[in-house]
Amino acid sequence: MIFTEVGSRAHPTIILLHGGGLSDWSWKGVAEALVERYHVVTPVIDGHGEDGRTEFHSIEDSADKLIRYIQCRLKGKVYAIGGLSIGAQIVCEVLSREPAITEYAIVESALVLPVKGVTVFTAPACGLCYGLIKRRWFSKMQAKTLCVPDEWFERYYRDSLRISKQSLINMIRSNGKYSLKRSIVDTAAKVLILVGEREAGVMRKSASLLHSTLSGSVLYVASGLKHGELSLVYPQQYVGLLEGLFAGRN
């Protein structure tokens, strides 16, 4: 896991974890809006982008690495941790292990209800489709599914070429079988849960489960938006929601 930092360490630290198949560049718009007031850290999750050579193992392993980074480099606590998709699952895992590690948490489109059959069928499915990932036309389709803006497609395509088959298998398995830990109820963080109105039913159910589990949390359903579209396509709106959370307006 590579940790990219912008802004002064004298400012409160916000950590933002990208979604599966993306990288730290996906937070560019959000980071630019925050950098004058915050120290912004955008990790590159194992198996992605510049860290494509490091095999992704699991959400739990990624949470371990993030916790160690915070403990060793950031005095054990940060102002906020946010994440999208698999990045949001990592945030949930961190909250379930370290209740006092952050003041605020932003969980966007986190799947916390296990998908049946994911362990059995992932490897055969990846065996059939892995070669397609290297093809530009297929990456174009995937980019649209992930709501990647057109100006970022070339970066997305280059990064997709770096993902190993085993990392892809591990990511899909870990994402699909992840379930919410009971210990997350002990978190001291104020949590904002985000989900798109046009996301799959299981994603909206996951958001509702998180909201009902976390006392005092705020659930925001982004009208008309799909999976990941809020932070990727509308960074200013995303930042506005963060500022509302920090100010207690949500």
Segments (PLM) and residue ranges:
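Conserved alpha/beta-hydrolase "acid-adjacent" motif
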Residues: 200-206
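Conserved alpha/beta-hydrolase catalytic His-Asp/Glu region
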Residues: 117-118, 133-185
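Conserved HGGG/HGGXW glycine-rich cap/lid loop of the alpha/beta-hydrolase fold
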Residues: 5-52
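Gly/Ala-rich beta-loop-alpha elbow adjacent to hydrolase catalytic centers
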Residues: 83-87, 91
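Short beta-strand/loop motif that positions the catalytic acidic residue
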Residues: 187, 193-195
